[in-house]
């Protein structure tokens, strides 16, 4: 006779434990004495989440789960007569400990679910073989102690006895994988696949919750209607960690949203703030998330737990820090500087090889086919191929690219995205923004496993690789370096030449001179676009830095914020193939799987410029750090920057970096203090244009605002200094550029060294390195997005400052001395002492070197820009005269032997008689002035 449904599915009201007895092969053997941390789930599990009801592996194999009923709460329900008891259950799994609160009826519901599970499994012929298990230890009883029946609450002795019964009941079940891994048990214990990943931090609050749609603080995502009209409620699995919360789709296991805690964090309970009975409202700068609980008591409990997590381990991110940065100063950080792209790219390549979990990249421009180590003799060091190999190993690569206005920029981010996305499913690329046409994502960042982060001025793009030689030519052996045609299908990697005997440093599009000609046909990466037989390349000077540990976590968090923001705001990225990213906890930040050699210990703080359009929040901590560092400097400032547009007039230019420099010099002059300011800028802006005819509208527009900052007009630095001290300003500030020379086509050639650095050194103790130029675009926060780090030395070494013994920081001093050594040609001047940047002798040597080199280059090449050309008429007359390098190459070579290093004075009088802003009739003239500033 067939069994009735009643006999198959007992009610479970009496919690008869005999119905849950296990056969010997169903009892899980626990391995005591092992290190639990070694058996916890790897971080990559976040990319392979499954629906909860598919019984995914939640607990670490072999690591026991121990339950302890630590207390009870008795309360009177508002809708019932009598009291209810809430049991606090503390659970431990390895290093993870968490508490859940349950009523007795929850135990009854669990018992019924487990009974149904056992009955169903007993009806499946192969069910016994589907459970991975082993025999129980000898003498281990397989009977589960019976639970007391439900009844009225009695004495404290009876309550304590009931606690012990519940505790034994749970612990007995938790030794059996058959029940422990069942979804009803994991829901009861409030655990998921994200609970026991050490890099995600402590085990926080979890459970099934109802959440309300909407609440985003992003234009276009905010509903202006009322709850019942515009919103919908959905059941989700909520996970709260120390610095964020997320919810997952119950049906698929996919992460549906991630809310990072930030200074806008606030938790509220009640219908007034949530418009929902038993509601909890979690506010951040990006969203007001409304959750609905089953009771007011649960709402208070959840609000308390979320708040305690955020104010405890996650407190770093719910408050602003020095300079109003989202990240605090991180002492004891390993940091290493890089001057020029050769060392930076090589270190990036080494870090990519060490990646085990994730690689994050964001650039203004990314060229997939660049080589990170040169000269290349194979494709092993080609960026796209390296990323493809790591993706094949299981590493997840996430790339954020600036989506340019194609009519204005020729960086072809669409090609870069396609080229990378076709390599492997583990490589995901997103572009942003769509609607913003004036501003850019200008930051440059690469993060490996959220423990090592590179940033600075260097995009992983054409033209950026260079070394201290600043070569103007790269001819090699043309027979060995002929580039093939690009592929006919973009599904193939671009073919490369046979590199076995390659001698070239810059292949194809990498050989460039951005003022002579901007890049074209980027989908043909190995075709030259300028004639390297007749045109010298333009050397590229840049500064980068790598940091380890907590600052790398902070930088990864910034990337994750931008990635998740882009996924949320752009409809095309809401599909599951673009995953939400999760930040690792700072609690494991010092567990470094690898470090790069050459690092020095310092205090590092991450700074940024972001706005609502770029990251969903506003911050301009880079500007604040610049102003503070200049204001507090005691001896000198050394600035290398691609742009220098400052000195606020309250209308056109708003940042006050130049104003702070003026104030600091005036303070030194008033106090009779020796104070120096060194400023290095590119001799010309990096836009395509013929400087012999004035350079074009873009070049002239940037020159206008640069000269307005330096020396022209009432707001300029030199105008204000001259008004206060006359010619003595020359004792305080020097403005220079860099130039070099070489041989091409049988005669000498010269070219400026394009300074793309974004660096400030103060007093040989403080350094700012990043992607931010000195202009409003980079510094105000409301325009371009930028990243930087403020590095403060904690390890000192003896040096000199104005002839007096001085304790200089190892990081800042080594960086500054390296820069000065290359700039001044110290390799050919063995007696040059670079320790003291302030004394009169060194400052005079600096000025004399710049003047001598500038005079020689002007005599030999009649190079531009020049102080001799103060008007367009003078410029036309100047360029028609044949330079000595053409007329008499041997004599020119002889004179060039007198050049020392690369330093030349910046020509402050170039085209000073001309109005350099574009005319209104030009396309540049109709653009807002903010584009140039």
Swiss-Prot record:
Residues 203-311 form the PH domain. Residues 437-464, 751-778 form the PLD phosphodiesterase domain. Keywords: Cell membrane, Hydrolase, Lipid degradation, Lipid metabolism, Lipoprotein, Membrane, Phosphoprotein, Repeat. It comes from Bos taurus. Residues 441-788 are annotated as: Catalytic. GO terms for cellular component: cytoplasmic vesicle; plasma membrane. Residues 65-195 form the PX domain. This is Phospholipase D2. It catalyses: a 1,2-diacyl-sn-glycero-3-phosphocholine + H2O = a 1,2-diacyl-sn-glycero-3-phosphate + choline + H(+); 1,2-dihexadecanoyl-sn-glycero-3-phosphocholine + H2O = 1,2-dihexadecanoyl-sn-glycero-3-phosphate + choline + H(+). The keyword Endoplasmic reticulum does not apply. One of its GO terms (molecular function) is phosphatidylinositol binding. Interacts with PIP5K1B. Interacts with EGFR. Belongs to the phospholipase D family. Function as phospholipase selective for phosphatidylcholine. May have a role in signal-induced cytoskeletal regulation and/or endocytosis. The keyword Methyltransferase does not apply. Phosphorylated by FGR. It is found in: Cell membrane. It is an enzyme of class 3 (hydrolase). GO terms for biological process: intracellular signal transduction; phosphatidic acid biosynthetic process; phospholipid catabolic process; regulation of vesicle-mediated transport. Transmembrane segments: none annotated. Its EC number is 3.1.4.4. Disulfide bonds: none annotated. Gene3D superfamilies: Endonuclease Chain A (3.30.870.10), Phox-like domain (3.30.1520.10), Pleckstrin-homology domain (PH domain)/Phosphotyrosine-binding domain (PTB) (2.30.29.30). Residues 1-20, 134-160 are annotated as: Disordered.
